[in-house]
Amino acid sequence: MAQAAVNGGAAGLRIEGIENLRAVRPLVDVPIIGIVKTDSDDTPVRITVSKSDVSALTESGADIVAYDATDRPRKDPKEAILASILANGAIAMADCSTLVDARVAHAAGVAILGTTLSGYTAATETDGEGPDLELVRQFRTLNAFVMAEGRVNTPSLAPDAMAAGADCVTVGSALTRLELMTAAFVKKIQGRLQ
């Protein structure tokens, strides 16, 4: 799947999990954003929650390490995770939900600001179907590299994100979660047949 994305023109990849990263790294030459997703009853934070995650990601070939930059509790403080990313020689990407998250991360030395968590935190829950283009515009004012991410689920939304100020766009579930795309096609077909 990673090679297919690169063959299709992807300029980089976002890879979840150490084993996936180890499998993909030797096969592609594009930059890889590495993350580890962890589910825990102790915290709603799921993306790169510990310094040990960071070490494993960088040792496995991640060029960039993304972490949850929201102000929610987690195993290791977000400041410690950022320090670990930088100490391990990787580029830091902050997965943010608000402009405040982005400002704090940018001031702390993060190179890439992502709208990844907009709509996925208690403070930002939304029924919106598309990416948070207003947040992209707000991030652009920080003079940082801006990654539009989250709910970019059709090709027509990617240029909209770029026009709003994104330097780059991450397309996730629309490409990787085939069950969601299949269900969307089935729903449309069934709706027309009824």
Task: Please give the residue ranges for each predicted region.
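Short, electropositive alpha-helical surface patch
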Residues: 34, 87-90, 162-175
